[in-house]
Amino acid sequence: MYWFRRKYRQIQRVIDFFPLIWKGFDFDYQYAVDLFKKQLERTANHLESERAITLSAPIKVQKIRTAIRLMDKVYEEEYAHEYIDKIKELYGENTLDWWFEDTGKGNDSSYLRYEYEKWDNADEINEMKRKLFKESIDKQKRAHKLLWDFIEHNIQRWWD
């Protein structure tokens, strides 16, 4: 009987992972992160189920779900893009509207131009954009480090 239950669970597992594996590529680490995240979700779901054995399962689930939320924030680059919202809040929604301008060299090359470059306070906006961009990137790096430090600190306890 155990053999049949085990095979059934293995087939379910293959079906569950199949879409993720199908769309994956070997040249991008993001797919490895997605696979790891999927496994963390499965582990959390197991620990929330009636099949969980340990009494500390709810605490483990909470930590796993925290790691998953952090992964979403880090790998969707939520912090890296904060500067865009801040610039728009300070200077207006269309500040960072952009277009390509032909260089005139006849080789299909172009410059990236921003709406604010036509404004009187373009230098101020550019300086603020650089400052806020650096802050956003630094925050993104800290979040990335925090995520993996959190996982390293907790992962060996995430089992049933």
Region locations from a protein language model:
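Long, non-globular targeting/processing and low-complexity regions
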Residues: 1-154
